[in-house]
Amino acid sequence: ALGGDYQVAERTRLYGRWERQSGWVSLAGVTDTGRSANALVFGVDSSYLRDTQVFSEYRLRDAVSGRDAQVASGIRQGFDLAEGLRATAAAETVQVVSGDGARARALAFGLDYTADPLWKGSTRLEWRHSGDVASTPGNDAFTTWLWQVMAARKLDRDWTLLARNHYLRTDYTARGDVLQDRAQLGLAWRPVDHNRFNALAKIEHKLERDSSNAAAGDLQSRAWIASTHADWHPSRPWWLTGRLAAKWQTDRLEQGVTDKFRATLVSGRVVYDITERIDLGLMAAIQAGQHGARQHAVGVEAGYLLQQNLWLSAGYNRSGFKGDADLAGYDYTLRGAFVRLRFKFDETL
């Protein structure tokens, strides 16, 4: 996604963004088929009261089925229930102006807790219902539920325990449901006395189930992913990062056929600051699969500091591979040119 906004008045702004989506999860929920789509969105929002936003958007979507035009309007509201306890709520309705889209409604509720210096947590529940498309022979109506919960517990000055769960379910009126459930547990080490080294270890259980296609049956994928990420800053111009990840996956395919997959990935990056605003980097990655399969990627990049903690980098991988998304994380491992944007922030943002 790429976008921007313009402040036209003290409490009113115009905004626009372009979005590119591909795969099984669309902007409205989980799709029944993999697809690609572009979207151009522009609108206006106003803050009439403190912590209250009213918005209206015009969305132009170019999907496989053709071009759809939609008008979306809604409201977002924040409430301070107590010191360190804040609630949020939002409502949205989408009306199709032209095309074969469906009318949709959405509600969202959230809760954030920051009162305790040792504990922090948040949760968010979203509901979205999309109606039937009149031009199609079947009933395409569906309801999507998204529930996210996150918690952080500071163990001491340097160590923090992290937990997160992401639950996404889409129930179709005329067929089965699609489910994604991701549970993560992590441990972060960030020394307070210096900024030379930090590390994050994480283990994740991921479950994906698709019962929306009666001919294919109940498809399921279950995986365990373990990873460790570390950063080392030995001196002012040098930055070294490394990642080690492993994955064990079991898939249930059509007609109950079971398939198992396991792989590991090791990657590293060395960055040298030429000046305060320009850096050069070297990246290497190796992914090892089953039966001795091995792939590697090597590349270089150059970065420029746009503003404090915001870097824009461009690079080229001389060799590469299509890495597993759960193993590679946000690293780009394909062969060819790439552009990436990095933004560093903490819990005070």
Each predicted region: which residue ranges?
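Gram-negative and organellar
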Residues: 1-349
